[in-house]
Amino acid sequence: MNSDPEEEAELPYEIGQAASVGDFERVKAWLAGGSASAPRSINSSGDHDWTLLHWTAARARSPEYIEFARYLISQGARVDAKTCHGWTTLHLACGFTGDATPVVVSMLSLLVATGATVNMEATYGHTPLFKIDRVSESTIDIVTILPRAGASLDFTHRQGWTRSFEEHLNQHIYNPSSAHVGAIRDLVASVRAAGSWKAHCRLPHKQILRLRSLVARGRVKLPRARRRSPRGRDTRQERALEFLVRQGDNGIVWNILSFWRATY
């Protein structure tokens, strides 16, 4: 059991279950009911070394779970505490909640923002990214949060072999034919090709500057500026791009790019 040097009360299974099902008032009542000889710590653990934060992160179903996790962390809950299998709260949030939902994404964001280690290895070497086992609409947000915070796209198993996240998507996803898997593959391929998350986010900036340079040297001709154009998001983006690449060395391009911070 994970515990501090002092003797603290073991976390009863039913209290862990209370955190799992969202009965947070019962959990708080249990925490308040300790004694000097057997204090009930926010980091008390029970079966399989699960703490209250493990139970809460693993079963996040509503915004109330996020608020309770925030409360636990504010009271000193260790975000990197490990279960007997070496899983941290990030591992459990990625792999135990079923399909990714906006609530799961919010839980991951909270854990990362409060210091969770994105490359923490479990007993066999798996990092949180490799606990993802199914893909839904919000999964790409998870695959954005973790690499953005520095998560590696590879992990080394305790037996010495290495697996890439691309291989993980091929072999360990329950629904590999999901329409969302393709978007994740494209994102991962772009990050890997760029060499880092920040470099991946800088690619659009470089592409605009390269196109602008070609226009300035007469290597590319843009269509004549239009007074009117059809409505639509794609058309507005095209017009914005045309505006950027038509600018000379007047500082406008650099000012715009300095404000355009693409998810990093």
Residue ranges and their predicted role:
Residues R26, E64-F68, V103-M107, D141-I142, ...:
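Conserved ankyrin/ankyrin-like repeat signature
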Residues P12, F24, W50, I66, ...:
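Generic preference for well-ordered alpha-helical elements
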Residues E7-I15, S41-A58, K82-F96, E121-R134, ...:
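Ankyrin-repeat boundary/"N-cap" motif
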Residues E166-Y264:
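Cullin-RING E3 adaptor/co-adaptor recruitment helices
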Residues A29-R40, A69-R78, S106-T117, T144-S152, ...:
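Ankyrin repeat domain, specifically the short helix-to-loop turn at the C-terminus of the second helix
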Residues P12-S20, K28:
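Amphipathic alpha-helical repeat scaffolds
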